[in-house]
Design a protein with these regions (language model features):
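Conserved helicase motor "Helicase C" RecA-like lobe of SF1/SF2 P-loop NTPases
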Residues: 2-44
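Intrinsically disordered, low-complexity segments enriched in small/polar residues
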Residues: 29, 62, 155-157
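Generic hydrophobic, helix-prone segments enriched in Leu/Val/Ile
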Residues: 22, 116, 156-160
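Long, largely alpha-helical accessory region at the distal end of helicase-like NTP-driven motors
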Residues: 130-160
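SF2 helicase/translocase ATPase core recognition
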Residues: 18, 24, 37, 41-42, ...
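Glycine-rich phosphate-binding loop signature in dinucleotide/nucleotide-binding domains
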Residues: 47-49
Length: 160
C-alpha cells in the first residue's frame, strides 16, 4: 500500500502511527530524501519481504518512481490539479502490470477537501469533454458554412 499526502510534515506524523498500528516499518519518501536513500527505500519496498506500506509526498511520487509492488493507493488529502494525483497513482499502476490497483481517496464531508474534490471532478469532466468530444459540427460543415463561421461580423461587433 502507498499512502500519498501533499504534506511531508503530515507523513512524518502518520508513518509512526501506522507503524504502531500495523506492527511494521513505514518508510517515508519526500522531496528532501537524498537520491541514494530514496533508491534504497524503493528497493526495500519492492522486495517481497519489504515493508507493506510506504508513505510518499505527492511531489516525490511524481518523479520516476516505480512502486508496482503495491496494489492499494490512498490519497490522504486532495491536490487542486488532478493530473498530479493521477501521476502519483501511476507510480503504482504501470503498463503490463497483472494485478489490479485500487485507488482510495479520503475526503471529509463539509470541508475544503470536499470543495476541492468538486473542483477536481469538474476539471476531469471538462477535460474529458474536450478530449472525447463527439461533436461533428466543424467536420460536417460545407466550405461556405465554415467561411461564414470564422468570418468577422463587423456590423455585429461595432453595433453599426
Amino acid at each position: 500500500m502507498v499512502v500519498f499526502s501533499q504534506y511531508a510534515t503530515f507523513l512524518r506524523r502518520l508513518a509512526p502511527h501506522l507503524a504502531g498500528e500495523l506492527g511494521l516499518p513505514v518508510p517515508i519518501l519526500h522531496g528532501g530524501v537524498s537520491r541514494p536513500r530514496r533508491d534504497a527505500i524503493v528497493e526495500q519496498f519492492s522486495e517481497e519481504r519489504g515493508p507493506g506500506v510506504l508513505a510518499v509526498s505527492l511531489r516525490a511520487g511524481g518523479t520516476g518512481l516505480n512502486l508496482v509492488r503495491a496494489n492499494h493507493v490512498i490519497h490522504f488529502d486532495r491536490w487542486w490539479n488532478p493530473a498530479v494525483e493521477d501521476q502519483a497513482s501511476d507510480r503504482v499502476w504501470r503498463i503490463g502490470q497483472t494485478r489490479g490497483v485500487v485507488v482510495h481517496t479520503l475526503v471529509c464531508p463539509g470541508t475544503i477537501e470536499e470543495r476541492i474534490a468538486t473542483v477536481i471532478e469538474n476539471k476531469r469532466a471538462l477535460a474529458g469533454s474536450v478530449v472525447t468530444s463527439t461533436e461533428t459540427l466543424i467536420t460536417t460543415m460545407s466550405n461556405d458554412d465554415l467561411a461564414a463561421f470564422v468570418s468577422l461580423d463587423v456590423a455585429g461587433a461595432t453595433g453599426k
